[in-house]
Amino acid sequence: MTDANGAPAEAAPQIRMQVLAQYVRDMSFENMVAQKGLQGGDVQPDIQVQVSLDARKRSVEHQYEVITKFKVTSKNKSGAAETLFLMELDYGGIFHVENVPEEQMHPFLLIECPRLLFPFVRRIISDVTRDGGFPPLNIDTVDFLALYRMELARRAEAQKAAQPVQ
């Protein structure tokens, strides 16, 4: 390609991303059924999954830490809507990211990085629920782009509400 003067146009540098580490930062699983001595007879689980994300720059150049936080609650739809189990998982990754424009870094970290971590999160949740005495829970795929957009809209509303009316 050439620019308007006929000189070769410089190609944008290719984005480079490398996963340096993945880890469970924090995890808990509470089996309320076993704790309360409930029978597993008439159980109709209602699963709710809450997801939040966090990212921060590390002291090493081009390195970022991304944390995905999942809170999974299962309640019994029939009867008194008792909680069957509660699982909380903070799963992190350390990423080396280069050649992403500064204005695109925030969405890149909160959309693309969690997308890479998600299969591992799903597997951990499935294994832990199975090991906790329940059928394995394979949570639905998370649309991290939609989640990012919802968070931006929420922040814009909060900022708008915080401004004094004149």
From Swiss-Prot:
Keywords: Chaperone, Cytoplasm, Protein transport, Translocation, Transport. The keyword Membrane does not apply. One of its GO terms (biological process) is protein transport. The keyword Chaperone applies. Pfam families: SecB. Disulfide bonds: none annotated. It comes from the Bacteria. GO terms for molecular function: unfolded protein binding. GO terms for cellular component: cytoplasm. HAMAP family: SecB (MF_00821). Belongs to the SecB family. One of the proteins required for the normal export of preproteins out of the cell cytoplasm. It is a molecular chaperone that binds to a subset of precursor proteins, maintaining them in a translocation-competent state. It also specifically binds to its receptor SecA. NCBIfam families: PRK05751.1-3 (NF004392), secB (TIGR00809). This is Protein-export protein SecB. It comes from Cereibacter sphaeroides (strain ATCC 17025 / ATH 2.4.3) (Rhodobacter sphaeroides). The gene is secB.
